[in-house]
């Protein structure tokens, strides 16, 4: 079992915080069935993910993209809802300035005063 240190990984990912995020996400990917790129050697998933990073046996861009897409909160069909809202807003009748002034004048003439 080869010992992996943070110094080995920092050479590949200079930011420690990014390293932790990438290694944790890669460990989750392994747990969910992603194929290993190195021998497990009886190591746990987080250690395997760090070893993969240290040995550059995985594409970190792929892991980073998977992490980002996993963190995005998009419901299925949300894009369709947004597009439907845009279409509805464009199709809605828009009140002109004259329409607003006429409605205001009619309200004034009716003597309604809802203010208290």
From Swiss-Prot:
It catalyses: RNA(n) + a ribonucleoside 5'-triphosphate = RNA(n+1) + diphosphate. This is DNA-directed RNA polymerase subunit omega. GO terms for molecular function: DNA binding; DNA-directed RNA polymerase activity. PANTHER family: DNA-DIRECTED RNA POLYMERASE SUBUNIT OMEGA. GO terms for biological process: DNA-templated transcription. InterPro entries: DNA-dir_RNA_pol_omega (IPR003716), Pol_omega/Rpo6/RPB6 (IPR006110), RPB6/omega-like_sf (IPR036161). Promotes RNA polymerase assembly. Latches the N- and C-terminal regions of the beta' subunit thereby facilitating its interaction with the beta and alpha subunits.
